[in-house]
C-alpha cells in the first residue's frame, strides 16, 4: 500500500467524477446535486512506475505487482457540516484514518453546473473545507479535556503530556489556524499523531480545471498554487473530465489522446507523485522469476523494517539485505551482472533504504 488519501470537496466540484476516473469505476453516483456520494467510496489503484516494468523484463518475471494507493471519497461537505448539517458530519470519522487529505477545488467555469455557494472561488472553497475540519477538531479536543483532567489529578504523567498537546492545539484552532501549524517536538510526535486531528494531516490541493487548462492551469489554479506554496502543501492540476475520458480508453488510445492534448501523462501519475512527496514515501523493489514487485516505505526506513513490510518474519529474523541500486540493476542487466561488477552490496540492520533499491532479504527462520 502506498498511502491512503481522503478526498473532500464541496458539492459539484467534480470530486466524485475524479474519484471514478482514478479508480476506473462508476461506484459513486455522480449527479448535479449535493450529497450524491451517500456512502464513503473506497477505491484501490495501482501506482504506475515504469521502473517496475523494466525490472520485470530483465528478471524475466512471470508477474508484476505494483504497490497500491487507496482513495476514500467522502460525501460533499457544506458550510455547517461539523454541526451535523448536510451529510458531512457522519463522514469525519472516516477521514480521520487517512494519511493525507486531498481538497478537490473547482477551478473551472461552467454555467450548466451549479456551485453550492453560487460562485467559482477555489480559495474560498478551501477555506470553507478547512473551517469545517477545524471545527470538527475543536469539538474532538474539547471533549477530551474532562477525562484528561481527571487523569492528571490522579498523577498520570502521560495524560499531563497529552493535555498540554491538546491545549496547545486548541489555541491554534481557536485562532482559525490548522493543527498542522503546531510546534511539536520529536518526543511529542507520536502522541500528537494519536490525537488524530483532521487539520494535522498533510494537505494536497487538487485543482479541477477545464480541458483547455489541463496542461498549464488557469488563473484559478494559479491562486491555489500560490496558497499551497505558502503553506508547504502539495498542489496538482487535473481535469476530471479528461481523466474520466482516459479511464474509458485502451492503453494505446490513452497514449494517443494524451499526445493530442499535449499532456505528458495522466493526472493520476501527478497525483501520486505529489502524494509521495507530501508524505515522504519511497519505493523499493524485489525482482525474480516469479514476480517483480514494488513496496512502499517512508523515507528513513531501515532495512529490517522495510523487510517487515513483506512479512513480519523477515523483520524478526533479519540478517542482511542484498542491495542493488535500480540504475545499476538496469545498466548491468540484472542481479548477476551487478554482482560481477561489484555493485551488489550486503547491508546490515542500520542500512537506510533508498528509493529505487532492488533488495533481497536474508533472514533466519
Predicted regions and their residues:
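Conserved G1/Walker A P-loop phosphate-binding module
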Residues: 1-112, 123, 142-143, 148
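Glycine-rich, flexible loop/turn motifs
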Residues: 26-34, 41-43, 51-54, 83, ...
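Amphipathic alpha-helical transducer elements in NTP-driven molecular machines
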Residues: 35, 49-52, 65-71, 85-98, ...
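Switch/coupling subdomain of P-loop NTPase systems
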Residues: 89, 96, 100-103, 108-136, ...
Amino acid at each position: 500500500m502506498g498511502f491512503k488519501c481522503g478526498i473532500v470537496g464541496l458539492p459539484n466540484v467534480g470530486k466524485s467524477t475524479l474519484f471514478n476516473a482514478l479508480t476506473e469505476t462508476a461506484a459513486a453516483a455522480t449527479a448535479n446535486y449535493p450529497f450524491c456520494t451517500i456512502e464513503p467510496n473506497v477505491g484501490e489503484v495501482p501506482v504506475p512506475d515504469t521502473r517496475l516494468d523494466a525490472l520485470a523484463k530483465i528478471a524475466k518475471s512471470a508477474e508484476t505487482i505494483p504497490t497500491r494507493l487507496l482513495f476514500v471519497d467522502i460525501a460533499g461537505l457544506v458550510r455547517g457540516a461539523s454541526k451535523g448539517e448536510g451529510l458531512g458530519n457522519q463522514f469525519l470519522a472516516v477521514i480521520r484514518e487517512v494519511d493525507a487529505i486531498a481538497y478537490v477545488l473547482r477551478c473551472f467555469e461552467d454555467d450548466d453546473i451549479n456551485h453550492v455557494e453560487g460562485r467559482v472561488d477555489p480559495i474560498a472553497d478551501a477555506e470553507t473545507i478547512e473551517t469545517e475540519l477545524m471545527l470538527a477538531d475543536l469539538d474532538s479536543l474539547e471533549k477530551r479535556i474532562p477525562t484528561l483532567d481527571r487523569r492528571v489529578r490522579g498523577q498520570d504523567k502521560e495524560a499531563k503530556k497529552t493535555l498540554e498537546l491538546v491545549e496547545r492545539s486548541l489555541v491554534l484552532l481557536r485562532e482559525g489556524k490548522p493543527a498542522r501549524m503546531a510546534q511539536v517536538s520529536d518526543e511529542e510526535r507520536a502522541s500528537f499523531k494519536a490525537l488524530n486531528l483532521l487539520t494535522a494531516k498533510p494537505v494536497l490541493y487538487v485543482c479541477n480545471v477545464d480541458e483547455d487548462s489541463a496542461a498549464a492551469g488557469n488563473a484559478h489554479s494559479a491562486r491555489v498554487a500560490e496558497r499551497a506554496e505558502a503553506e508547504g502543501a502539495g498542489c496538482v492540476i487535473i481535469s476530471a473530465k479528461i481523466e474520466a475520458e482516459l479511464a474509458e480508453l485502451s492503453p494505446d488510445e490513452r497514449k494517443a489522446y494524451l499526445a493530442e492534448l499535449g499532456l505528458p501523462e495522466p493526472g493520476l501519475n501527478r497525483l501520486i507523485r505529489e502524494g509521495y512527496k507530501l508524505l515522504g514515501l519511497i519505493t523499493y523493489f524485489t525482482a525474480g522469476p516469479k514476480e517483480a514487485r514494488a513496496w512502499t516505505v517512508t523515507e528513513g526506513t531501515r532495512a529490517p523494517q522495510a523487510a517487515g513490510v513483506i512479512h513480519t518474519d523477515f523483520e524478526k529474523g533479519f540478517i542482511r539485505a542484498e542491495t542493488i541500486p535500480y540504475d545499476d540493476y538496469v545498466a548491468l542487466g540484472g542481479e548477476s551482472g551487478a554482482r560481477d561488477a561489484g555493485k551488489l552490496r550486503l547491508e546490515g540492520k542500520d542500512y537506510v533504504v533508498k528509493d529505487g533499491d532492488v533488495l533481497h532479504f536474508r533472514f533466519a527462520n
